[in-house]
Amino acid sequence: EMVALPLLVLDLTGGSAVHLGLIMATRTAPAVVFGLVAGIFADNFDRRLVMLVTKIVVLILSALFVALLITDLLVLWQLYIFTFLRGASMAFDQPARRAIIPSIVPNNLVTNAVALTMGSVQIMRIAGAAGAGLIIGFGSLSAAFGTVVFLYAGAVIFTWFLDVPDHQRQAYRGIRHILTDFNESIRFAWGNATIRGVIIIGIGYAIFGMAFMQVFAPLFAKQVLGIGETGFGFMVSVMGIGGLIGALGLAAVSPTRNRGTLMLGFLAAFGALLVLFSGVTYLNSVVLAFIVVIFLGAGQSLFFPLMNAILVESAPEAMRGRVMGVLSLDRAMTALGGALAGIAAGALGVQLTQIIFGVGCLITAILMYTLYPALRRVQ
């Protein structure tokens, strides 16, 4: 879906960077509305059940979407609605999925577990993206989205059989107390210096870093490097290879000291690599671009698990869902970043805009290291 959706948008809109950015913004915007509520659900209900229900909803939405696509009834406004509803469903999945990890592994292995989770995502990125590129190149977009439906069906089955110990939670007190829980989660997250710092870092990454795969990469593939749908699929796979290497390396080393400084360093490296990638594309060298993409994947897989592990370890068991829900507000910045990336790429060109966004990541890391000592003290 990561490969097929941007290509479908470009196909429906005649290559519009603006619509691509807005679609990706629509996909992540529901996290703004539902993120904190989803965190409350993750703390008040069985997290496995929350994950199961969201996956069933996404499965149904995906099946309806494929039916519209196969029958040639899909139009652009329907695509906006689908991406919003899917984003709303996944907004409830993420806090529960992230908060459930400490219930499965000991505290000293949380970083390893988050890194291995990221590694599994990279394996699917490698296989799924390459497969999507081949399916689209030799088949159709409909076939790619049809494959997604089967994958979600498998996810529903595996989640059903997931054996997770119940977590400490308060009894559900009714809809009236949701606002109280909402305010409590905001006060706790913002009152904790470490959590507040991680959220600010997450906002910077969401605005400047997340737009690469959602907006810039498909534009580079089709409009700059000229490698088309199949090439874009392989680009995502190559990034997955780098991501897998980074995730497995982090899980093997499992740093227990200076994790805050490491997190900021990996974000700075990711920003510098974004600038380098855009610079390499001026040479029109696909090989060099793909080499940089490998390192981009590694940088992302080193930064993101550390950020999540620090966050989840900084919250008590009964608050973890709500804290992860607060982090979901960073997805609002992903929506903003995606929209800005599409608009700016349409006006300034994709290469210059990517350089600007890469510098944004780099500046975020440097400023937080310089001005926010609480993150440097995280071990």
Residue ranges and their predicted role:
Residues 99, 103, 145, 149-176, ...:
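Helix-loop junctions on the cytosolic side of multi-pass membrane transporters
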Residues 1-29, 187-239:
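Helix-loop boundary and gating motifs at the non-cytosolic
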Residues 165-200:
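Juxtamembrane intracellular "pre-TM" segments in multi-pass secondary transporters
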Residues 32-33, 44, 50, 54, ...:
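C-terminal transmembrane bundle of multi-pass solute transporters/carriers
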Residues 14, 46, 68-73, 279-283:
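Helix-breaking motifs and short loop linkers at transmembrane-helix boundaries and internal kinks
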Residues 8, 64-68, 131, 135, ...:
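Residue-level signal for alpha-helical transmembrane segments in multi-pass membrane proteins
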Residues 1-3, 24-40, 46-61, 78-137, ...:
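Substrate-agnostic recognition of the 12-TM MFS/MFS-like secondary transporter fold
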